[in-house]
UniProtKB/Swiss-Prot annotation:
Associated pathology: Brachydactyly A1: An autosomal dominant form of brachydactyly, a group of inherited malformations characterized by shortening of the digits due to abnormal development of the phalanges and/or the metacarpals. Brachydactyly type A1 is characterized by middle phalanges of all the digits rudimentary or fused with the terminal phalanges. The proximal phalanges of the thumbs and big toes are short. Some BDA1 affected individuals exhibit short stature.
UniProt protein name: Indian hedgehog protein
Gene: IHH
Tissue: Expressed in embryonic lung, and in adult kidney and liver.
Entry binding sites for Ca(2+) 2: E95, E131, D134, D136
Taxonomic source organism: Homo sapiens (Human)
Site residues by UniProt (Essential for auto-cleavage): H275
Domain of life: Eukaryota
Length: 411
């Protein structure tokens, strides 16, 4: 059957998807999606004094990126800065010029998100900004304060015992680099608005290997739709699953990856920060009860699932770091999971609920089953996940998404 004749069926599937997703999203108002399991809140680990996250220099691709030049009020780039009048944030503004309120939109979005987290964590306490955009040259050369991409923050009560946890909340709010720099403040910064790494989506490096049903191990760059790769079934057991399409395929793009290293057995997996990985807080959890977690939220001491002998087994996370590599590949399998570098991962990214994502992709799986063929994967982000991402932004809570969003989504 030709793709042209199948198009009406696909449109019907999308309409049916909307009918399914809208009641689930709106039926309980601002609360969680109907049918989703309530998970206990994840324990937040405060940053130690002088610790920074991610554990790379601030002006590298894996963090906030390079310095792009000072912005003055008279410069063309001044229009990139926007004032922040959020009443839930206190701005010190010691210059009395309003400069501390000026920042890039990305910085503003992260700061507003952090302000909510601060009020939830400490009722009656607000976020306080001591330094924002700097036009007077008070910071070191090539400081991101000169571009409106950095802020120094405290809590309104100036309780220094809170600053380690404040730094962790800033990481969770999506700042691209957070540094517990001083006993007097926490430093946070973001990527530039037009940075190529500003949105990461969910991918693996080109050289990451998967296992085929034949037993051969191949790089993701060599995988094609129709291949059967090792994955995890709904019951937590290993299975081989058909590769349907590539949700993202960008062979020539540099990406910043989160590197998860385990011990007993040793494994090393690189994936983008917004990608979902299955984790548990102890090794006694059955595989089917491991929860989907953003890669950027995985911490040493947690457990991930790895391919062992026999079946799948937990492995303790020993270290987490960042790495920049060329190429980005995100295959979608029939089961919505795959085993990459012998570590079990979800096929999905950007949205926190793996099961909701798997449900949302059933029209694509149906279309694939009706139009089986030897398709050559194109480059870039597939249109369907972009559509779902935009739809989800309208229907789901902000907390349902990773702060870095999805590459090419235009959000």
């Amino acid at each position: 059957m030709s793709p042209a004749r199948l198009r009406p069926r696909l449109h019907f599937c999308l309409v049916l998807l909307l009918l399914l997703v809208v009641p689930a999203a709106w039926g309980c108002g601002p609360g969680r999606v109907v049918g989703s399991r309530r998970r206990p809140p994840r324990k937040l680990v405060p940053l130690a004094y002088k610790q920074f996250s991610p554990n790379v220099p601030e002006k590298t691709l894996g963090a906030s990126g390079r310095y792009e030049g000072k912005i003055a009020r008279s410069s063309e780039r001044f229009k990139e800065l926007t004032p922040n009048y959020n009443p839930d944030i206190i701005f010190k503004d010691e210059e009395n010029t309003g400069a501390d309120r000026l920042m890039t939109q990305r910085c503003k979005d992260r700061l507003n998100s952090l302000a909510i987290s601060v009020m939830n964590q400490w009722p009656g306490v607000k976020l306080r900004v001591t330094e924002g955009w700097d036009e007077d040259g008070h910071h070191s050369e090539e400081s991101l304060h000169y571009e409106g991409r950095a802020v120094d923050i405290t809590t309104s009560d100036r309780d220094r015992n809170k600053y380690g946890l404040l730094a962790r909340l800033a990481v969770e709010a999506g700042f691209d680099w957070v540094y517990y720099e001083s006993k007097a403040h926490v430093h946070c910064s973001v990527k530039s608005e037009h940075s190529a790494a500003a949105k990461t989506g969910g991918c693996f490096p080109a050289g990451a290997q998967v296992r085929l049903e034949s037993g051969a191990r191949v790089a993701l760059s060599a995988v094609r739709p129709g291949d059967r790769v090792l994955a995890m079934g709904e019951d937590g057991s290993p299975t081989f699953s058909d590769v349907l399409i590539f949700l993202d395929r960008e062979p020539h793009r540099l990406r910043a990856f989160q590197v998860i290293e385990t011990q007993d057995p040793p494994r090393r997996l690189a994936l983008t920060p917004a990608h979902l990985l299955f984790t548990a807080d102890n090794h006694t959890e059955p595989a089917a009860r491991f929860r989907a977690t953003f890669a950027s939220h995985v911490q040493p001491g947690q457990y991930v699932l790895v391919a062992g002998v026999p079946g799948l087994q937990p492995a303790r996370v020993a270290a987490v770091s960042t790495h920049v590599a060329l190429g980005a590949y995100a295959p979608l399998t029939k089961h919505g999971t795959l085993v990459v570098e012998d570590v079990v991962a979800s096929c999905f990214a950007a949205v926190a609920d793996h099961h909701l994502a798997q449900l949302a992709f059933w029209p694509l799986r149906l279309f694939h089953s009706l139009a089986w063929g030897s398709w050559t994967p194109g480059e870039g982000v597939h249109w369907y996940p972009q559509l779902l991402y935009r739809l989800g932004r309208l229907l789901l809570e902000e907390g349902s998404f990773h702060p870095l969003g999805m590459s090419g989504a235009g959000s």
